[in-house]
Design a protein with these regions (language model features):
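Nucleotide-activated donor-binding/catalytic signature segment of Leloir-type glycosyltransferases, i.e.
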Residues: 14-39, 52
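Acidic, amphipathic alpha-helical patches
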Residues: 17, 40-44, 86, 143
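Short acidic alpha-helix that forms the nucleotide-activated donor recognition element
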Residues: 38-50, 73, 91, 109
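Acidic donor-binding loop of glycosyltransferase active sites
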Residues: 45-62, 76
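Conserved acidic donor-binding loop of glycosyltransferase catalytic domains
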Residues: 56, 81-82, 99-100, 105-107
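Short glycine/serine-rich donor-binding loops of glycosyltransferases
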Residues: 65-68, 86
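Short hydrophobic beta-strand element within catalytic cores of glycosyltransferases
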Residues: 77-80, 90, 97-98
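C-terminal amphipathic helix plus adjacent low-complexity
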Residues: 116-198
Length: 198
């Protein structure tokens, strides 16, 4: 069963799920949410029903990955693209699997033409994100291997889920986050006091 939970932003994306169900009749596709966002209750139900959380995101909008943290807090192993903030959350081989991807538009030595157009105000944010997404290639064989690994090994699935839940408690629990903010404020205040009023 493929359970999708979230917000389908347009009819094209909604149609892709219809096409998926048509092309793979042996696959049961269930969606929570849709053209309107899933409710908090629906999200909790989806996490409770899931065995694995998969987010093969391919765009710049996934800079942190709150949904990944929610899945880890729910004790689910995570399969996510090795992209932006996801790689800071998922420990490859320990709390889940990171699927390699490449940004075909990115160059090492200078900003891409697309990034330059955005910086100059010639492209808006939505267009830039959309066009960048077209240039990101996900390793589909690695995604398939990660899914098969977790589906064929309930023990590994459980161990990764447990490790993810522990990681959340250690690094991302509200008590930890508040303590880190307090420490940052103390450091910033010390810098301000050292340099005097501006």
């Amino acid at each position: 069963v493929l359970l999708e939970c979230g917000h389908i932003y347009n009819d094209t994306i909604a149609g892709a799920y219809v096409e998926l169900a048509r092309r793979f009749p042996q696959l049961t596709v269930r969606r929570l949410g849709g053209l309107t966002p899933a409710t908090s209750e629906e999200k909790l139900l989806a996490l409770a029903a899931a065995d694995v959380f998969c987010s093969p995101a391919d765009n710049l909008q996934e800079t942190f990955g709150l949904s990944v943290l929610e899945a880890m807090a729910s004790g689910l192993p995570v399969i996510a693209s090795d992209w932006n903030g996801y790689r800071d959350l998922v420990q490859h081989g320990h709390t889940g699997w990171l699927v390699p991807c490449r940004d075909l538009l990115k160059t090492q030595s200078k900003p891409s033409a697309l990034d330059q157009q955005f910086a100059l105000g010639l492209k808006d944010y939505d267009s830039t994100v959309g066009l960048h997404s077209l240039g990101v290639v996900l390793d589909h064989q690695a995604l398939e291997a990660a899914l098969n690994d977790l589906l064929e090994s309930p023990e590994r699935c459980q161990a990764m889920g447990d490790a993810g839940a522990a990681r959340i408690q250690t690094l991302f629990h509200w008590d930890q986050v508040c303590q880190q903010y307090r420490q940052l404020w103390k450091e910033l205040n010390a810098i301000r006091l050292k340099h005097g009023e501006i």
